[in-house]
Amino acid sequence: MDYLYDFSSKYNCLFLRGNRDEYMLEQRKIIAQGIENGRWRWNSASGNLLFAYQQLNEKDFTFFDQLPITFRYQKIGYPAVTVCHGSPVSSRERLLIEGENTKEWLKDIDTDYLICAHTHLPGELEYQGKHYYNCGSVGIAIGTCGYAQCMIIEDQCINGKIAWNPIFLKIPYDNKRVVQDIRTSGLLSKAPWYVNSNIQILLTGTDYSSQLVELANKLAKEAGEQDFTDEKYWREAAQQLGVPDYR
């Protein structure tokens, strides 16, 4: 967070609030109201979130709270762009390249360009003369282990009109060093199986994280339990999906 504050003090930056930022704000309210149900615990279901939460301070929460979930980027002489994390109305809506909701949003927005993230899957879609670009993910890049995904847009002239053209980048980094940092941080012991899934993505590009959550929940319900935080359900789900134990 200090890096973001320092960088934005030197350069013109625009920030969005993502779903994880909202989780942090919601957890803060739960704790402030003294509500036990919904509080994060050290387990595979919420331990990774609690770990992040405990690194934050009041300045960070204020920063998150002031962020928009969408904005319109307008530069004189260039086409306007709608920018959001998930969708223009929700940081948690997934706009996949082939998704029907993606096409609906392209029809609904009042710009010809929509830039999103959230899915961790970079790509582009042209639909009815409008353009959807997903920049992918820097931290948890699916399908490209050892690379951080990001995107820049460049202006180009097409048939006498200015248009935005995406350039999708893959930036190499030391993913094994990141995994070692995760191990030494103690995070693996606080949220073992979800973090194991994250490490699998970092090392192989293979993502089972959402399936892991769904299967652990399903196994718990089949056992007659509503609470799926017991690690035995996560361990069984991981074994069925092929998520290794990196501890």
Map each language-model feature to its residues:
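Active-site neighborhood of phospho(di)ester-bond hydrolases with catalytic His/Asp-centered motifs
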Residues: 14-19, 84, 113-122, 132-136
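Short loop/helix-cap segments at secondary-structure boundaries that form the rim of catalytic
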Residues: 73-74, 106, 123-129
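Conserved hydrophobic/aromatic beta-strand scaffold that supports enzyme active sites
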Residues: 70-72, 83, 124, 150-152
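Acidic, His/Gly-rich catalytic cores of divalent-metal-dependent hydrolytic chemistry
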Residues: 127-135, 139-247
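Active-site environment of divalent metal-dependent phosphoester hydrolases
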Residues: 20-25, 89, 115-126, 140-143
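Active-site neighborhood of divalent metal-dependent phosphoester bond hydrolases
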Residues: 3-71, 78-80, 96-110
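A short secondary-structure junction signal
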Residues: 86, 92-97, 125-128, 144-147
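Short acidic, glycine-rich surface-loop motifs adjacent to enzyme active sites
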Residues: 80-88
